[in-house]
């Protein structure tokens, strides 16, 4: 399975908090990479390390043209942590993961398949849906 990245946040002690579109959050320790390849030692410069961002498409993270990591490296070697938002994903991420149209999910809400306030909820302009309810109604993700 391909684990696309939604957000990355640099932390102290050369660690990264990585949020995947599947709703999983992991902590990735960059320090072991300093010994693996010379190019990663440049991350010891705090300005560069703290400039990390998710590449277009969520397939990895990037610091500059020479230093990047794939989403699979972060998934395989990151340590999963729990957060208050575990099990919740945005409706747009759910449509991507399950291969559905957003209108399909909106109809599921209006027909009562997904219950507002229990399975889905709107926060500001953003709808979030529980992964559990998506699996219940649409099965395991196709991707």
Please report, for each region that a protein language model flagged, where it lies by residue.
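Motif-centric detector for short Cys/His coordination patterns
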Residues: 1-126, 130-143
């Amino acid at each position: 399975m391909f684990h696309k990245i939604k957000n990355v946040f640099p932390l102290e002690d050369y660690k990264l908090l990585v949020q995947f579109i599947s709703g999983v959050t992991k902590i990735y320790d960059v320090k072991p990479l300093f010994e693996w390849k010379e190019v990663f030692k440049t991350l010891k410069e705090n300005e560069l390390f703290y400039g990390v961002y998710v590449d277009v498409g969520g397939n990895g993270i990037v610091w500059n043209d020479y230093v990047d990591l794939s989403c699979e490296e972060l998934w395989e070697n990151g340590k999963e942590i729990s957060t208050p938002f575990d099990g919740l994903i945005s409706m747009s991420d759910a449509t991507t993961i399950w291969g559905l149209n957003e209108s399909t999910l909106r109809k599921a809400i209006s027909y009562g398949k997904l219950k507002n306030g229990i399975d889905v909820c709107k926060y500001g302009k953003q709808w979030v849906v529980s992964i559990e309810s998506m699996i219940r109604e649409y099965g395991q993700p196709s991707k």
